[in-house]
Amino acid sequence: MKFLFQMDDPKKININEDSTYMLIKESLNRGIDCYYNDPRWVFSEINKVNKIKSHVSRLSLKKNNQLSYQRKILKEIDLEHMNAIFIRQDPPFDLNYISNTYLLDQLKKPLILNNSKEIRNFPEKHIMMNFPELTPPTLISSNIEAIIKFIKKNKEVIIKPAYGNGGLGIQKISHNKTNLSTFLKNYIKKFSNCPVIIQRFLKNFKKGDKRIILINGDIAGAVLRVPRTNSIKANFHAGGRAVETN
């Protein structure tokens, strides 16, 4: 059994909080051969047939449980020979990210988690548009006039980039913020002039937010993320803590 983990540099992940590390560790403990690749290493080789290949490096665990791989010893493989490919790299969700999904779309045999087509077609922060009845008042836009109108109506809001992660760029702003228009222009420019997400500020945020894990539509587990004192962010990367929940 061979698993490929497409991810950021394994040597830089925090083994105490990174879920990718836990997936790799458990796979290795079960005797599965695990490999690492950077999404930039994937390529299409077309000559009568189309082969999707990548350079990969085999993963192992050191005695201190840190992940180990040899960056200088890379092996070129046909990705059809993998049993499963885990797409685990962090955003930005940009053209490099999207181009990689086009290549992975061509694979027939490996199980790809999560499906590359679905990752591309349903960016996680846009999925809420399918559930408006469960979503607080929200605006997704890069139009300054529309954003200011929304902020003035809702008084206090949370703003965040549409394609970020780990709490990056999340801020609370008020309708009476000084130089609001200039702030918004600079904020949008900082995040590649892409649309941003603005939501009405929910005052019960201290209770945390619940992440639910579904497998084929069935609930497999859940965790409550609670922000630390004096913070509005419940993201684990931003200091949020995990609390047991039903």
Give the location of each predicted region.
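Extreme N-terminal starter segment of soluble prokaryotic enzymes
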Residues: 1-4
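Short, well-ordered coil/turn residues at beta-beta hairpins
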Residues: 6, 86-89, 161
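Conserved N-proximal alpha/beta basic substrate-recognition cap immediately N-terminal to
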Residues: 11-142, 146
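N-terminal cationic-hydrophobic initiation segments that often serve targeting/anchoring roles
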Residues: 28, 105, 151, 188-189
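A broad, low-specificity signal for short, low-complexity segments enriched in glycine/proline
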Residues: 41-51, 74-76, 118-121, 158-160, ...
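Short acidic, glycine-rich loop/turn motifs
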Residues: 60-61, 161-163
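Phosphate-binding site of ATP-dependent enzymes
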Residues: 145, 152-155, 163-246
